[in-house]
Amino acid sequence: MKLSRKKFAFIIGISFLVTIVVGLLLPESLVIPVKGATRADWNSKSFWFHPWGKSGVHKGIDIFAEEGTPVLAACPGIVLYTGSNPVGGNFVSIMGPKWRVHYYAHLKTVNTRGWTFVRQG
């Protein structure tokens, strides 16, 4: 059985739409991603586009801990990319529920690789 281009495009479109909707419907329950950290360990003034250093704006939460403290996944997801850059040092980007990307930076080491699934915590 050979599919016409229209049917094939329709199937691809529906599959894409279902994937988007399912991603948005997945529940998101976050945990603090630094082992042993509490709400008292982050800088609430650095949240939501607060000016931060040379980068100008900063969207996220900085959680402070001793060097070498394990950093865990705030939610389950797929590792999109790992690497290093001058601003964030060693980092990991994870796509979680609701299509949100979680960026973990300033890591001493990275113990995962791209396109792997990680569990929360």
What is the predicted role of each segment?
Residues 2-90, 119-120:
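Surface-exposed, glycine-biased beta-strand/turn segments
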Residues 53-55, 94-103:
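Short, basic/aromatic beta-hairpin or loop at an interaction surface
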Residues 61-63, 94, 105:
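Preference for bulky hydrophobic residues occupying beta-strand positions
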Residues 72, 82, 98-121:
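Short histidine-centered loop motifs in beta-beta connectors
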